[in-house]
Amino acid sequence: MKELQEILSSSQHILPEWILLLGILLIVIIVSFQKKDSKWPYRFSFLLVLIYTFSATYFYENLPAGGLKLYGGLLLVDQTSLFFKQLVAISTIVFLIHCRLFDYKFDGEIYFLMLCILLGLSFLSMTTHFLVIYVALELVSISSYVLVATKNEKMNFEAAIKYLIFGATSSAIMLYGISLFYGMGHTLNFAEPAFIQAIAANTPLIIQIISFLFLAGLLFKIAAAPFHSWVPDVYEVTSTPIISFLSFAPKAVGVLVVARVVQSNFADLNAVLLLIIFLSLIIGNLAALWQTNLKRMLGYSGIAQAGFILIGVLKSPQTDFYGAFFYILTYLPITMGAFLLADLLKNLSGSDEMEDFKGLGQQNIFLGLNAVIIMMALVGLPPTVGFMAKLMVFSSIVNLGEAMHSSVYYGLLIFGLLNAAISIYYYLKVPYFMLIKKSYNQPKYNNDFFLTLVLTYFSISLVIFFLYPDFGTEWVRKVLF
């Protein structure tokens, strides 16, 4: 009877997820009875995500300081999980707007899968329980595999198979790590004191190796090295609004789970994270240098961006993950703007190849300026909010070096600055081709004023948040652990 009361009591506190789950069941019915080209799945999905966003925002207004532990510790609802749920919901809304702007005629199954990913990420953001992490991650992963394969083309099937193979491998490695942790700690909740005490009896090296195994599934979703091989092919062939969503939402929540693992302090994971950061930065940046396809370049740069974000997750006596969370907040408009730009450029040129963008910025100067601002934000140059994000991450390295009295972190600072400098070359290739290079025998392009205007809103927001960062910084400070 006591267990039943616990379940009923806990269920009252996840109303947004119940709304989302009910909506997912309803959209299955809508898709089953509507024509293939019906707009009702899109309209219903948009309304459902709006309701979910508002309910997730206002339902948890009076959360206690330590959050709410639900279902006997399976779930943890706190300000941090709420922050990430809001970011993922906003990215879903941007995905739906992106589909509308560029007149993507997706089948209803696409929206069903997208809502499943949203539900999985929602649960993933509010747990410290190994079992919930694994199940939620599998819901996200399986839905993602199907999304990539939705285009009935050979390249999409090949990319989806590669995505599936790497995903299944990383999930198996992760499950093996979880089983080892369960054998050592005799519980599946890594935030419980009993688990931390039991783990402490083992040698640090063994714990670090097992932690790396557990992190495999999360690193796969974050698109961090060495679990990154699926990225370029999937980014190239997947529809732009879908990959725009997948490039942000799983990465953001994956970083949150890594931060929760670091914050629980059952092991010193800095050595493991440093290896991942170094690999992600060097592989992502060097591979991006040689790309001629914009979406493949954004894929490789996303690997490097994962490395920069993980810098903010490194553990120190003063760790609060402020740099990582602020970076993720700014990464939302930057990455969504970048993929909107990519889609608009493809519409105008008929290709994702950067050489085909020659002269587009000369014909439409506002489009060229938007490209400059968005690419500067990805590099981390002023006057864009990307500069603030990079600055806070690099500041956290300096503080870490002072607190830990280790030159390794100062080496990481130099390495990070060098990689940021390298990224200037491949990011600014886009405005270079648009504004500097001239195209001979150039066809007449139909410049879409409305789409350029929407893109301009993203660009202006990147500059405004640089000039007035208080909104973002205060929001992040409220949700720190």
Question: Positions of the model-derived regions?
Answer:
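Alpha-helical transmembrane segments of multi-pass membrane proteins predominantly involved
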Residues: 1-481
